[in-house]
């Protein structure tokens, strides 16, 4: 059973998907929107799980053991419908909270979701050494940045 923490959980898309996939157990979540969090708690049994409202206040020392850190950090800073300021937008910098927690806890797996433009921003900061989420050389680990459109998921919307 792979234990995971659901960051920027919204109403629980990652949790629902991982639950349906099987072999995953959620041990905590983070969500700042009180209405989304209320829905999350109504949809899932979260009693006894770790919770923090604001990712910027997440203390890695208080987090339970987990192998997978997942999160769909806010996309407005990276989307064509939003500002597209990337990490220049305060919402875009929430990606760094995931990186901070990953650096501190070193989970076996990271699973992040966002719009395609975020790849460009992440690659830039990796190449300029502003942050390192790439695995160390000779570690045997690999980093994959994959881009899927809703068409890959058989949905008719274009995003």
Region spans (language model):
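Conserved active-site and SAM-binding loop architecture
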Residues: 1-159
């Amino acid at each position: 059973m792979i234990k995971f923490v659901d960051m920027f959980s919204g109403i629980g898309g990652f949790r629902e998907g991982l639950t349906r996939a099987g072999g995953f157990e959620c041990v905590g979540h983070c969500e700042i929107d009180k209405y989304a969090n209320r829905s999350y708690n109504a949809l899932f049994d979260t009693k006894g799980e770790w919770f923090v409202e604001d990712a910027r206040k997440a203390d890695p020392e208080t987090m339970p053991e987990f192998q997978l850190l997942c999160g769909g950090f806010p996309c407005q800073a990276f989307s064509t419908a939003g500002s597209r300021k990337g990490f220049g937008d305060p919402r875009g910098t929430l990606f760094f909270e995931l990186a901070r927690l990953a650096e501190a806890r070193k989970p076996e797996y990271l699973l992040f979701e966002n719009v395609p433009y975020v790849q460009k921003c992440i690659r830039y900061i990796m190449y300029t050494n502003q942050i390192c989420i790439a695995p160390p050389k000779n570690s045997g680990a690999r980093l994959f940045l994959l881009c899927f459109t809703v068409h890959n998921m058989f949905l008719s919307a274009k995003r």
